[in-house]
Design a protein with these regions (language model features):
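Structured catalytic/translocation cores of nucleotide/phosphate-coupled proteins
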Residues: 76-77, 95-101, 117-121, 125-126
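Well-ordered alpha-helical segments within folded domains of soluble proteins
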Residues: 37-54, 86-103, 142-152
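Asp-box/WD-like beta-propeller blade repeats and closely related beta-sheet repeat scaffolds
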Residues: 110-148
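Low-complexity, Ser/Thr/Pro/Gly-enriched N-terminal "stalk/linker" regions
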Residues: 1-73, 108-116, 129
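Phosphate/oxyanion-binding loops and surfaces in catalytic or ligand/nucleic-acid-binding neighborhoods
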Residues: 17, 104, 124
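A short, mixed-charge helix-start or loop-turn motif at secondary-structure junctions
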Residues: 28-34, 76-81, 133-137
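Mid-chain, structured segments of secreted extracytoplasmic proteins
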Residues: 61-99
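Proline-rich intrinsically disordered, low-complexity coils
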Residues: 20-23, 84, 108, 125, ...
Length: 152
């Protein structure tokens, strides 16, 4: 079996066994009895599926990514389980999916959600040097992955 077949089988199983409420790639929360929320890990996976769609043209990747993000994003651009006042860069990461999805499927609510996340960044606490704090609960801390998460 070639690499492409292995990847296809793996991704197919991952997608077929995942929902926004219970993603197969992020089961730690579920095992702990917690509800899945808008989060960093899901943002990484959905971004990867969008990139797979762009590489392969396989509509199922885009459809899954769109359905997944659509579950969280409300018509007015608010996002379920996302509180901008937490000032948590981890929650900004999933917002990267909105750029491509808006370009690819054109849902106005995705554009509105981008604005919601942008408003957080406008007021995100910063160090005296102007760098974003990683989270409000970690005053003056800068984390390396924050560079990845807070840049589109």
């Amino acid at each position: 079996m070639g690499c492409n077949q292995i990847l296809d089988r793996y991704i197919k199983q991952l997608v077929e066994t995942s929902t926004p409420q219970a993603p197969a790639w992020n089961i730690e929360k579920l095992r702990a009895g917690k509800e899945n929320t808008w989060n960093y890990i899901d943002g990484c996976m959905i971004k990867a599926l969008i990139e797979l769609y762009e590489i392969t043209g396989e509509q199922r990747y885009l459809t899954f990514a769109d359905d997944y993000i659509d579950f969280f994003v409300q018509e007015d651009g608010t996002i379920k389980h996302y509180d901008p006042q937490e000032y948590n860069l981890d929650n900004v990461n999933a917002g990267k999916t909105l750029y491509k999805l808006y370009d690819l499927v054109g849902k106005p609510k995705y554009r509105a959600a981008m604005d919601t996340i942008y408003r957080q960044l406008e007021t995100q606490p910063r160090t005296k040097e102007g760098v974003f704090w990683h989270k409000a609960v970690y005053p003056n801390q800068i984390w390396l992955d924050g560079m990845y998460m807070a840049q589109p």
